[in-house]
Curated annotation (Swiss-Prot):
Gene field: HRGPNT3
Keyword Kinase: no
Species whose genome carries this gene: Nicotiana tabacum
Keyword line: Cell wall, Cell wall biogenesis/degradation, Glycoprotein, Hydroxylation, Repeat, Secreted, Signal
Residues covered by region (Disordered): 34-620
Mapped Sequence repeat ranges: 229-235, 236-242
Function statement: Has a specialized structural function, possibly in the mechanical penetration of the cortex and epidermis of the main root.
Protein name as it appears in the record: Extensin
Compositionally biased tracts (Pro residues): 34-45, 106-129, 178-219, 251-552, 562-613
Length: 620
């Protein structure tokens, strides 16, 4: 199994990683060491001899304790990798063992084939037998290309030679060293070094792990160290010759290292035997390494995606929040947005709402609920009424229906509480309004905050009345008076003028109590007498509903509105005349401070209103 794993690893790593790294590093290290081996270059001839011994030797290494002797052969070729291995004596050796063999093979081919060809053949041979390679090297050195094929044969023989491993007499072991010289030939590896560089890093990372395992080899060191060292030294010399052929300089240095390292390497032989194990471990490392990189990349992306997609969406959402943020003024509206569904129900009220503003906010609202049906028509009429407002006569008729409706408005008070929702709803209702709401909302927040609800409906109507607004312009000021009391002040005068126009209403002046009339207007019928006072109590809630104060103000504006309608129906204008002083009040009312005040004035009126209400009601 390990062999198979080694094969796979060796094949892969060999092709580029191990061979390249070992060749590159070994060559570099050899650069400093092989010189001595160069001296023993003659051994190449011995190499030819050594091949036989090498086979025997190598099998021993694999087959038996020969590990010590094996170590020598190993040293022979590992030394080249020694440069590498020293750091990782244990693990790399196996690879190096393989690599060196590859070098052994490569040395002849290395110049040309070593990089491209050797890797393939190496894949198989190295795994088969590090030592096997050595012998094969020794045998094959003459025929580089053959070296590759023979290696396999060599491998097989080594296995078969395991018994020969017994032969592996010390002399063969020495010969085995000569095969290492063949490894020394690895000098060609220098050529490899280029390709090695390709995957050196990959190979490197894995080797360390392998090294760890090799450590066990130390025991073998004990046995091998001494003989291996000696053998190594001579082998190194022999190696040098091969090295010389390809790159004596580079390889020469390695030999010295080999000598010192041989001891270190001695363990590698066992490591070699173990090498399969290491290689298994090793094999995992490479995979692990390769996967880790991708996984990191992937892992980040997913997070990035999950965050970024969500984040991105979040940003996208965040923008909406800004968009909503404008609504924030809408603060209620947002909720109401959700309610919008219900808004449908409200939707009628919203239209109704639009009318409600005119009638008169405080009581009429209550009566307004029923108006919804009538109101629904009124809204249309309302939109015209705005223009007709000036045409006070028409509005009255239109309003008259609202009046009946108003009686039922009592529920609306609750609706009023919803007004905030309605507020949001108004936007839905009037698409055009939707934009205004924001604009509106800003002003409302300051002073309008309460009015907004009630006002919001009017705005819808307003939006519709835009044309009338021109005519309305005076009332509009009245409407906006809350914020622009200055403008409002003019409206009051206008109101006063209106009263003059209403001079006929003077009889309605009798309704002076009706100043609440605006309220009574609707209330008078049902809401009227008692409700009106109670209605006032509800208005307090409206007061609580900040909107009510605006209501009062709206009333005031409404009067302006209503005045047109009221002329026929309401003596509201007369009350306004009476309120002429209040008109200033109303002006102040716009200021908010008067907000609170306005409620009380209505209250004051309320007392009178009740009796008149009763009378009025009785009259109807």
């Amino acid at each position: 199994m390990k062999l198979s794993t080694l094969f796979a690893l060796v094949l892969l790593l060999q092709s580029t990683a191990i061979l390249s790294l070992v060749a590159a590093e070994a060559t570099t290290q050899y650069g400093g060491y092989l010189p001595p081996p160069v001296t023993s270059q003659p051994p190449p001839s011995s190499i030819g001899l050594s091949p036989p011994s090498a086979p025997t030797t190598t099998p021993p290494s694999r087959g038996h304790v020969p590990s010590p002797r094996h170590a020598p052969p190993r040293h022979a070729y590992p030394p080249p990798s020694h440069g590498h291995l020293p750091p990782s004596v244990g693990g790399p050796p196996p690879h190096r063992g393989h690599l060196p063999p590859s070098r052994g093979f490569n040395p002849p081919p290395s110049p040309v084939i070593s990089p491209s060809h050797p890797p393939p053949s190496y894949g198989a041979p190295p795994p088969s037998h590090g030592p096997g390679h050595l012998p094969s090297h020794g045998q094959r050195p003459p025929s580089p290309s053959h070296g590759h094929a023979p290696p396999s044969g060599g491998h097989t023989p080594p296995r078969g030679q395991h018994p020969p491993s017994h032969r592996r007499p010390s002399p063969p072991s020495r010969h085995g060293h000569p095969p290492p010289p063949t490894y020394a030939q690895p000098p060609p590896t220098p050529i490899y070094s280029p390709s090695p560089q390709v995957q050196p890093p990959p190979t490197y990372s894995p080797p360390p792990p392998t090294h760890v395992q090799p450590t066990p080899s130390p025991p073998s060191r004990g046995h091998q160290p001494q003989p291996p060292t000696h053998r190594h030294a001579p082998p190194t010399h022999r190696h040098a010759p091969p090295t010389h052929q390809p790159s004596p300089l580079r390889h020469l240095p390695p030999s010295p290292r080999r000598q010192p390292q041989p001891p270190t390497y001695s363990p590698p032989p066992p490591a070699y035997a173990q090498s399969p194990q290491p290689s298994p471990t090793y094999s995992p490392p490479p995979p692990t390494y390769s996967p880790p990189p991708p996984s990191p990349i992937y892992s980040p992306p997913p997070p990035a995606y999950s965050p970024s997609p969500p984040p991105t969406p979040t940003p996208t959402f965040s923008p909406p929040p800004p968009a909503y943020s404008p609504p924030p003024t809408y603060s209620p509206p947002p909720p109401t947005y959700l309610p919008l569904p219900s808004s449908p129900i409200y939707s009628p009220p919203p239209p109704v709402y639009s009318p409600p503003p005119p009638p008169s906010y405080s009581p009429p609202p209550p009566t307004y609920l029923p108006p919804p049906p009538p109101s629904s028509p009124p809204p249309p009429s309302f939109s015209p009424p705005p223009p007709t407002y000036e045409q006070s006569p028409p509005p009255p008729p239109a309003y008259s229906p609202p009046l009946p409706a108003p009686p039922t408005y009592s529920p609306p008070p609750p609706t009023y509480s919803p007004p905030p929702p309605t507020y949001a709803q108004p936007p839905p209702l009037p698409p055009t309004y939707s934009p205004p709401p924001p604009a509106y909302s800003p002003p409302p927040p300051p002073t309008y905050s309460p009015p907004p609800p009630t006002y919001s409906p009017p705005p819808p109507a307003y939006a519709q009345p835009p044309p009338p607004p021109p005519t309305y312009s005076p009332p509009p000021p009245a409407y906006s008076p809350p914020p622009p009391s200055p403008i409002y002040s003019p409206p009051p005068p206008q109101v006063q003028p209106l009263p003059p126009t209403f001079s006929p209403p003077p009889p309605r002046r009798i309704h002076l109590p009706p100043p609440p009339h605006r309220q009574p207007r609707p209330p008078t019928p049902t809401y009227g007498q008692p409700p009106s006072p109670p209605t006032f109590s509800p208005p307090p809630p409206r007061q609580i509903h900040s909107p009510p104060p605006p209501h009062w103000q709206p009333r005031t504006p409404t009067p302006t509105y209503g005045q047109p309608p009221s002329p026929p129906t309401f003596s509201a204008p007369p009350p306004r005349q009476i309120h002429s002083p209040p008109p200033p009040h109303r002006q102040p009312r716009p200021p908010t401070p008067t907000y609170g005040q306005p409620p009380s004035p209505p209250t004051t009126y309320s007392p009178p209103s009740p009796p008149p209400y009763g009378l009025l009601l009785s009259t109807p």
